Amino acid sequence: MLIMSNINITESTIALIDSLKSTTGAFGLAGTGSEYKIVTELFLYKFFNDKFGFEAKHDKIYGPRLCQSEKWDAEYDSFTEEEVEDLFSYLPSSVPRMKPEHTLSHLYNASGKGDFSTLLDATLEDIATLNADTFAVTTSGKSRVNIFTKVTTYITDVQKRDEFAKALMRNIASFNFEDVFTEKYDFFSHIFEYLLKGFNNAGGGKYAEYYTPRAIAQVMARLLVGDNANLRGITCYDPSAGTGTLLMALAHQIGEDRCSIFSQDLSEKSSEMLRLNLILNNLS
């Protein structure tokens, strides 16, 4: 496989975000509070799909079987329930779990059937439940907020929901995240900043209230950490983390494998973006 340059990867990822926003705009959701939820959820669903496939293909037990197939997800469809659970047991805890019926290929192939919007929403909720222990956010009241919710119900005209769901599938089907999984903080922080900027005024709120620009966060992290390259077992806690940019910069400066980060925030919007930021940087 030809590995794209960093510039091409960045441009393609930004184009994915823009295509999703184009679809939400075409269905009358541009600038609404629901737009950022739809775009970030579909962006993250595609990330989950490709991350799971990437890690599954590198598994020592099942990887060779998946790699020998022209399309890994087609081969994955043939797995028994026992084989699926066995594969899950070998994957790192940070890797999202997806059953064969959750994959993009499976969904895309079903998009021509009736009531596809219901299938898409049910699939997202099923993935959220399956991965709740790893990716759900816990509120101060100890309630869990799952990573995915229904997205097509934001379209008030029920007759247009299937069309909307199919358009979202077309947006994400042509992109592949696999080329970016070897990238680190510098790449993902730029993508996250672009994604965040697009929803700065979404739903009447301003993410700028919760956001430290990446350049400033990097300077702050360098000042806090200094040139100490021997830090180990460091704990970083931000009680008002916003979207987590400073925490990401600190983890990068210290070393992602040499620190643990903890965060919270009062804002539901910023907490959702914080979770996305953590997942993209493999720090969930």
What are the residue ranges of the model-derived segments?
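Non-catalytic, mostly N-terminal accessory regions of nucleic-acid modification and defense proteins
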Residues: 1-224
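Conserved S-adenosyl-L-methionine
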Residues: 206-284
